[in-house]
Amino acid sequence: MRIAYETMLAEFERVLTKYGFSPERAHEAAEIFAQNSLAGVFSHGLNRFPRVVEYLRKGEIDPTSEAECIASFGAMERWDGKRGFGPLNAKHAMDRAVELAHQFGIGMVALGNNNHWMRGGTYGWQAADAGCIGICWSNTCPNMPAWGAKDNHIGNNPLILAVPRSNGEHIMVDCALSQFSYGKLETMRLAGKQLPVVGGYDADGSLTTDPAAIEETRRMIPIGYWKGSGLSILLDMIGTILTGANSVATIGTFGDEVGLTQIMIAIDPAKFQSADLTDAVIDAIAADVASSEPAEPGREVRCPGMGEHRSRKENMELGIPVAEEKWAEVLAM
């Protein structure tokens, strides 16, 4: 089943308006969810939308609250998200980081006390659209064991790196620090598929490719094993220092995944060189990667983010594939 982009956008906008968003903010927020689905990231588009509505119903998200700057020094600012709508606060924070980068060459906004930003790649892509290198990350609730542990004390804190291309075909890594995000586990389970590689442990303590089994135990494995575990811990520390807000451990006391810490960094390469030279560097590296001999005959080797361009084009032309039960939930709201 496929749904036209404009239809999906209109339904998201209708629901958000119903739950207290102004028409302008409802449209801006709905675009984020619809664009995520258009890009093929259903886990943080349609599939995540009902959960956000549940948070609105419970009063965990204030649809009228807007983040504000509470401290600044040169190219750095600290913002309080006031537990408002996470994606809009994050978008506005990256907008400001880009403004600072255009002024100083680099800009950083440390956004504390925000709610879930949905897909972190939204903000890396946003920076790249503005001609900037984008670096951003968020912490989470404790949802992953540290390396060597059984219980969850660290987050699968998503990390995003994006580089801009003048033609809009940016290169971007958008990854949770678990082998698979919980959103991806849900997407694979709904599709009735196994994971391509092991992603965590089942109830017997065995490594498994069964997404439902990992969702049940909540014992995911970090990317790179101990390396991903260490990276998660340090990102949490750096983010908490810069925001003066909530660590993974503190978020774990809130009951729901709210009050998160997020860092937005933008770097303007035009301060050093022309966009043509930046494009040439990216194109040369991408071409070299693509020239690799594939491990499996006929398999494409490519840079991260390149599949997204194809998904956007295909889904705009043919409609966005949806899980029927998720779409029915939205229509019933």
Where are these regions (language model features)?
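Active-site cofactor/substrate anionic-group-binding motifs, chiefly glycine-
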Residues: 45-100
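Secondary-shell segments that build the walls of catalytic and ion/ligand-binding clefts
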Residues: 190-251
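A generic, well-ordered mixed alpha/beta core segment in the N-terminal half of proteins
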Residues: 77-166
